[in-house]
Amino acid sequence: MKLSKLCKVGMSFLTKPYYRTRVLIKSGYYDNLSDEDFLKKIFPKYMGYPLDLENPKTFSEKLQWLKVNYRNPIQTVMVDKHKAKQFIAERVGNQYIIPTLAVWDSVEDIDIDVLPNQFVLKSTHDSGGIVICKDKSSFDFEAAKAKLSASLKRDYSKIAREWPYQNVPRRIIAEEYISELGSDDLLDYKMFSFHGEPKLTVVCSDRFSKTGTRMNFYDINWEPMGIHFGHYPPLPNEFPKPATYEEMKRLTAELSKDCPFLRVDFYEIKGRLFIGELTFFPGAGLETFRPMSKDYELGEWLHLETVHRS
C-alpha cells in the first residue's frame, strides 16, 4: 500500500467513528460480545444516537430488537440464496425465481464444464459473493474461485449480528445469466412489508454508475416520501409506478404474511417479475434516515408488542 493511501486510511480510522467501527468489526475485535452488547456498542457509531432496546421507537432500533429477541428458524431458510427459491416457489410459484443450474459445497467442486457459456456464481450465505461469466473463453476461473473461497470463509452473521445467516449452509450456486440484470437502466424495486402488509417501495437506480446507487422511497399510493437513506441519495426526478406494481404488492403480502417485517426485492424484465432476495434487516438497520422523523414514522408500523420473543 502506498504511503499516501496508508496515511488516508489511518486518518479515517482515527477521525471517523463509522469507519473505525467497520474496521474493528472486520478484525474480530467485537466477536466475544453478546449480540445485545455488540449492538449497543456499534449502533451509536452508525446512527448518532444510543440504542434503546427496552423501549425502541425508531424503525432502526426495532430492527435491532428483532435481531436480539425474535428468532424464527424459517428466517434462515428465507435468506439462504438456494433454499429461498424453494420457499418462494412454494408460496407464490417458481415463475418468479431465477433458475438454478447447479449447487456445490466448495469451490473445488465447481464443474465449469456442465455450465452454459454464460452464468452467475453466488455464495449462498452472504452478500457480495457474486461472480458473473459472460463468456467462458475469457472467464478467469481461478480469480472467481479465489473470490468465492474468501466469501465461504466469511461469517456474514458476525458483521451486524444478523443471526439468520449464521446457520445457512455455505455453498456455491450457479444461476442462469439474465443479461438485463446487468443493465445500467435496470431498476430494483424493494418493497417493505410490516406484519404482512406492504407499506412502501424503494426504487434503486444507477446501481452500476460512477455516482453510485440512488434510492427513491414511495408510499403505498406511490407518493414520494422524501427519504434520504444512508449513503444513497434520491434522484431529483421521480419514477412512474411500474405496470406490475399490484402484482408486487400481492406477492409481498403472501411472502411476508408470517413476518413482523420483510423486504422483498423485485426486478421487472420485459413485463415479467423476478424476486431477487428476501431481507429482514435492510442495511442491517444501521443506515440513517433523513429526515430522522421518517425513522420514527416507519417505526410506528412495526408493532413489537405483537411479536413473541423466541
Predicted feature descriptions by range:
Residues 135-136, 193-197, 269-271:
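Short acidic-glycine loop/turn motifs at beta-strand connectors
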Residues 250, 268-310:
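C-terminal active-site "lid" helix and adjoining low-complexity regulatory extension at the edge
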Residues 55-134, 143, 149-163:
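A conserved helix-loop-beta module that forms one wall/lid of the active-site cleft
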Residues 167-171, 215-275:
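A long amphipathic alpha-helix within ATP-dependent nucleotide-binding catalytic cores
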Residues 104, 125, 176-178, 193-195, ...:
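Short, flexible loop/turn elements at secondary-structure junctions
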